[in-house]
């Protein structure tokens, strides 16, 4: 399951960041200065909807919940896996440019910089990236009652077809080992979200990585 999510979001990140490659420091001195300053990542205006909740079904008994506010500047992703003999729930709180991840019932988690892609609209990527990942615009399609943009791409040996609405993933189909693995929204709720869900949990220590 983690491989599926990695494949989609890695491709999304690469495409979204493709236009900023030329802004990287060209010299070692410039690189050092940038590292020392360590600016906090800025995450804003990622989605075309201010706030909401989306529930997903995924392979291997996996369910996911996405809570977001301030147009995606802060969000919480809860991933629950039920294999019958074992159950796990991981929570990822993303806000203020950082991602805080921990597993339910544990007292330690991790904190790292959150460099979220500003867009999942592949058509906005530069031509070289579009060619490298064989990105194709497949038009639009109604998924879960939403008019979604549809794209196909290839990340490594895993072809991906994705549907997004207001820059939010609604469905993805990843082909791995000849089988289709589907992540799809089952319920979409527009509207306000309880701000408490974005609070860091008491009793959990986050180690920065």
Predicted regions and their residues:
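Extended soluble regions of mature proteins
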Residues: 24-25, 33-209
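Basic side chains
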Residues: 2-3, 19, 74
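Residues marking helix boundaries in flexible regions
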Residues: 15-16, 55
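Sec-dependent bacterial lipoprotein signal peptides
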Residues: 1-15
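Bacterial lipoprotein signal-peptidase II cleavage site
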Residues: 17-25
